[in-house]
Amino acid sequence: MHCIGVDVSKQELVTYDGKKERIFPNARGLDEFTRFIKGSTDPMIVFEPTSTYSRRLEALCRRRQIACCQLNPRVVPHLRLVGKGRSKTDSSDAELLYRYGIERGQGEATQLENDALADESIQARLSCYRVVQKSRVAYQNVLEALSQDPATSSVLLDEVSEEIRELKRKEKQQIDAAQKLIEVEPVTKHRLELLLTIPGIGPITAITLLALFRKYGNANRSQIVALAGFDPIQIQSGTSVHGKSRISKRGNREVRRRLYEATLSAARYNPAVRSLYRRLKEAGKPEKVARTAAARKLLVIAHAIYKSGEAFSDQNQKEA
């Protein structure tokens, strides 16, 4: 197996294969890097996922079924501390990734599933939707302020109102585009329909959850909770340090936000979520604690339905 450590940046891929450092442009298609890979026998690529900058490399691994090891970005700084060097450069990071691949990568490497939605990601559409939504909310706040000022002309109010209507149209456009991507695969479309059967979960939350579940298809319940940042953290040391337990918040922030908002409806109409929410409130827990627990419960229910392929029912909730 030919191990290649790749440090990904916005413009370059810095690689190290145990013999030589090479630099390739991080351009659409990764043509130069692809030609280099073609000359390798049984390549294995070790890299850190860096959001949008590593998407092209991930897509290449999918298309060519190249084994890859996606290393948590928190690992490399620790490798640097225990190594000989302390400096951080793209070259040193590529070499650290290579050495990790030689020592442990073969047992951790996997082939990314060929995802028909990878080239035009659902996540990308959701990101565009969030940008438009923030702009729309900002304009609505401005309109509210201007409407209270008698000096504001009706022409300006009409212009801001028209801008809000246009942003709402763009929001719908992004969500419709995401749904069209989902409809490409009948199985994925069916799973989205299953998520929409859950009381409290609307189209945007369902699409957000679907993207998470698709990305981590092999994750179990505890892992998906951690990936959303709902896993608990305890702070305790000896007899003197006893901090309050809290959620880690190390996972997907957008998933947490969507689920937290969904609890407003789920706490009223979803029996299992309502029962948990009311029990915590009756026990004197703060509103934020009760809603966070309800959001975690909603995530677990949604994941159980996604994995089972069965529509929502009270039985699903009992098992979750």
Language model features: what each stretch is:
Residues 42-53:
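Short glycine-rich phosphate-binding loop at a beta-alpha junction
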Residues 1-18, 97, 208:
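Gly/Thr-rich phosphate-binding beta-strand-loop-beta motif of the actin/hexokinase/Hsp70
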Residues 18-44:
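Nucleic-acid-processing active sites and adjacent nucleic-acid-binding tracks
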Residues 283-320:
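Basic, amphipathic alpha-helical segments enriched in Lys/Arg and hydrophobic/aromatic residues
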Residues 70-194:
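Long, charge-rich intrinsically disordered scaffolds of nucleic-acid metabolism proteins
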Residues 37, 110-124, 152, 243-246, ...:
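Short, solvent-exposed helix-loop connector elements
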Residues 203, 209-283, 287, 319-320:
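Phosphate-backbone recognition surface of nucleic-acid-processing proteins
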